[in-house]
Amino acid sequence: MLMRLVAVTLLLSAGIAAGAMSYSFVSKASGRLGGPIRFEFFRDSTTRRKTDIKSFTVSTRTADDRWKAMWSILGGSGLTQPIQYGVTPPGFTTMIRPQKLIPGRVYAGSATDGHGGSSSVTFGFDKDGTMIFPDSFDQ
């Protein structure tokens, strides 16, 4: 019984420690189809820009509710401007080449900073190419 208590205590401690090392930051998407689609990152609000992004991926939700990467970049440091869809920033490497974005589909832009931080923004485009952020994509 004592061994079980010790094992559970150790597992809980490890879970708390792992949770303490991860955090989220803010991602913002803007633009429209046919024009630049930009992604910006902020530390804890929309006033302190985050520049230490290490990976960024745009994925689309498939018909079976899975996610498929549409574009992915890796590396980098000292991001000085927003990431533009399909344009690999200096110091980054393209892992998956960009594919065409289509109205009516659901997309997610996901970023990590290499220090345990991550962020995601879910978006789509209406028929005229305007970026939308509906409450639910399941309607």
Please state what every model-predicted region is:
Residues 97-105, 129-131:
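Short beta-strand segments and strand-loop junctions that repeat across beta-rich extracellular domains
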